[in-house]
């Protein structure tokens, strides 16, 4: 698995769950802050973010090399456990 980008806010419990899973797996990642519900740059309703995650929710991860994206904490945690 290549380096991951985690989109979200650190004070969001689902984002923290994903971050903890990555830390426990010693998987390198980069955190990009996304403001939930905001339609401006850096917001979850901005077209750039909606192109990655059409549901506009956090957390969302992206594989830096392949561009593969996945949203929803449960789906992400299942993916990371494999």
Model features per residue range: what roles?
Residues 1-82:
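GST-like domain detector, emphasizing the conserved glutathione-binding G-site
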